[in-house]
């Protein structure tokens, strides 16, 4: 079984985990090509392209100018990514067994690096998958990556007995590999997290992000291989809601005022 998640916009390179190995990302050549294109953008044009503030544009212009494919100043991506999903994952409390299970079973989609394993070393960057970066005749990153990401994941998953994918990525990122759903022996399960608000269950983005991280960690810590066991997830007051679920979507709900 494979878990798919999105990266985070925020990176923290202040800490380095010397006990973990560091590996090279598979799509390093593509990352280099994208960075070379992004180096052509000045602060103002990067601000417009990424729809970010002038301050963030300046920061990321500098990042791209200084970017290196070398692992010398890199960090393992699972340790470096921050944000709500990664707060839920909470790698700081992982055992070595958890880390290595994650490296085998967790994949992080990335606008720059394509597909990352947790131990893959990354350098500072910001590039969301939905960015309309034109390069080499491709109008955006979805076109640029094409079937490369699906092919990479399929090679990985073909060696597994359980060929299920647990989709804990955002729509923006899973869209890059959405056609994987049409491949015969692949089953894609998407956990969805909803809060009870104003008389109905709704997806509250920031809470859903953290819940996706909690579910990711639940799978990793418990070494789950049976999809039925996902229904046992009950962190932060969430419970499996059979009535709202179907074969493809597992819905977990909670009353925000009655957290555990």
From Swiss-Prot:
GO terms for biological process: response to hydroperoxide. Pfam families: H2O2_YaaD. One of its GO terms (cellular component) is cytosol. Belongs to the UPF0246 family. This is UPF0246 protein Cbei_1739. It comes from Clostridium beijerinckii (strain ATCC 51743 / NCIMB 8052). The lineage of its organism: Bacteria, Bacillati, Bacillota, Clostridia, Eubacteriales.
């Amino acid at each position: 079984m494979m878990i798919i998640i999105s990266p985070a916009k925020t990176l923290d390179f202040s800490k380095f985990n010397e006990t973990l190995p560091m590996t090279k990302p598979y799509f390093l050549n593509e990352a280099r090509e994208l960075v070379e294109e992004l180096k052509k953008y000045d602060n103002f044009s990067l601000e417009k392209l990424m729809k970010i503030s002038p301050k963030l544009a300046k920061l990321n212009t500098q990042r791209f100018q200084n970017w290196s494919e070398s692992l010398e100043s890199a960090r393992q991506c699972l340790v470096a990514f921050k944000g709500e999903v990664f707060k839920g994952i909470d790698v700081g409390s992982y055992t070595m067994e958890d880390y290595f299970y994650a490296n085998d079973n967790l994949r992080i989609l990335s606008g720059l690096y394509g597909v990352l394993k947790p131990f893959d070393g990354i350098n500072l960057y910001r590039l969301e998958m939905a960015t309309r970066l034109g390069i080499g005749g491709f109008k955006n990153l979805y076109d640029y990556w094409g079937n490369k990401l699906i092919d990479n994941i399929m090679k990985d998953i073909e060696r597994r007995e359980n060929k299920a994918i647990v989709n804990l990525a955002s729509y923006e990122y899973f869209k890059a590999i959405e056609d994987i759903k049409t491949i015969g022996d692949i089953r894609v399960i998407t956990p969805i997290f909803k809060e009870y608000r104003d008389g109905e269950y709704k997806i509250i983005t920031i809470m859903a992000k953290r819940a996706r991280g909690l579910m990711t960690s639940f799978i990793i810590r418990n070494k789950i291989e049976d999809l039925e066991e996902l229904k046992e997830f009950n962190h932060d007051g969430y419970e499996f809601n059979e009535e709202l679920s179907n074969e493809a979507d597992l819905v977990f709900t909670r009353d925000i005022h009655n957290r555990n």
